[in-house]
């Protein structure tokens, strides 16, 4: 009972809303000294009046040096559009394949820019609710049943992995001299369009067909 009251008291003391520069500095200093994880300890260690979840999201989506805060490039736009055709509104899966971008960044950019740029049948089927949902990518699905609903997430994971495999094969086929030049460009310009590592998935149109990433078993769950 005492533990519950203490937790309720702590929850009431947590701040919400915009972070201040001072709060950001406290969080960055903590991560610098203690690393990521154990976010709930930050309150006790630093006195920062933010819950562990808020600290984690603030770090992952804004403060982490791995987050690219620059404008989206044409290559990134192309990649996001391709992945959305495969995966629908599964922003976490998409963001893992767009180096330096978070799922929130990708989701917000899709809703505010990319979905409005697309025209025709595909754009009319796009949902812009801003949340992950169970909608199916319009490229493949016209009707879905509930019999395989529980298998859909595994199917999307498998599709994403096949996409990774296609890109990895494309990477291996590139001449070593070209790869070395791209590594230098990436190091000097920080432009992800020059990078062909396993975490960057820009491939030419000729390298794959989206429909080839669906197996017969996958299709069974959607038709």
UniProtKB/Swiss-Prot annotation:
Localization, UniProt: Nucleus
Principal location: nucleus
Keyword Nucleotide-binding among record annotations: no
GO MF annotations, alphabetized: DNA binding
DNA-binding region(s) in UniProt: 39-63, 91-114
Pfam families: Myb_DNA-binding
Record's keyword terms, sorted: DNA-binding, Nucleus, Repeat, Transcription, Transcription regulation
One GO term describing the cellular component: nucleus
Record carries keyword Hydrolase: no
HTH myb-type domain segment(s): 11-63, 64-118
SUPFAM superfamilies recorded: Homeodomain-like
InterPro entries: Homeodomain-like_sf, Myb_dom, Myb_TF_plants, SANT/Myb
SMART domains documented for this protein: SANT
Role this protein plays: Regulates the production of a signal that induces hair (trichome) precursor cells on leaf primordia to differentiate.
Protein name: Trichome differentiation protein GL1
Lineage: Eukaryota, Viridiplantae, Streptophyta, Embryophyta, Tracheophyta
Gene of this entry: GL1
